[in-house]
A protein has these predicted regions:
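Bacterial N-terminal signal peptides that target proteins for export
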Residues: 2-13
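The canonical Cys-X-X-Cys-His
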Residues: 30-40, 90, 105
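N-terminal signal peptide c-region/cleavage motif recognized by signal peptidases
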Residues: 17-21
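Boundary at the C-terminal end of the N-terminal hydrophobic targeting segment
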Residues: 22-26
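Gly/Gly-Pro-rich "capping" loops immediately C-terminal to redox-active cysteine motifs
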Residues: 43-80, 87-98
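Protein kinase-like catalytic domain
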Residues: 38, 72-75, 113
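Flexible coil segments in periplasmic/lumen-exposed cytochrome c-class electron-transfer proteins
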Residues: 88, 97-150
Length: 150
């Protein structure tokens, strides 16, 4: 069957809309839930929220569960990031962000950290971590264990 010009245009438009819908949404989820405190580029806010990039992430990214557990379960206590000390808490986002959106968000944060060839997070991976017990304090303990800090 031969498509007429209008048919071709409609088919092309449908394909464009379908492909846009399939684009990763991590940057949008990040903008909605994270950028107010951590800034759009992940540079953080002095005295409020630490940077999501810097030398500490080279170690933290070695434990693939760290970042999702912090976002799912929260983090509370004293941490030092890029020579700045933060004392506070980040709320858990498990109730507000779906597994699929969380996977996209975490993959976006990897990109902010310069982990261009990082393995993208998957919704199934987030779902499995969501069932694990955890709390803001357990996220702090995990962080301390990875970084070798007290």
């Amino acid at each position: 069957m031969k498509l007429r010009p209008l048919g071709r245009l409609l088919a092309a438009g449908w394909l464009l809309v379908a492909s846009i819908a399939a684009w990763p949404q991590g940057d949008k989820v990040y903008a909605q839930h994270c950028s107010a405190c951590h800034q759009p580029d992940g540079s953080g806010t002095v005295g409020l929220a630490p940077a999501l990039k810097g030398e500490h992430w080279q170690k933290l990214s070695q434990d693939r569960t760290y970042l999702p557990l912090v976002v799912l379960k929260g983090l509370a206590g004293r941490i030092t990031v890029n020579a700045q000390t933060f004392v506070g808490s980040m709320p858990p986002w498990a109730e507000q962000i779906s597994d699929a959106d969380m996977a996209e968000l975490l993959t976006h944060v990897q990109a902010l950290q310069g982990i261009a060839n990082g393995v993208p997070y998957r919704a199934e991976e987030i779902a499995a971590l969501r069932t694990k017990p955890g709390s803001p304090m357990s996220s702090l303990q995990l962080r301390q264990g990875i970084l070798g800090a007290k």
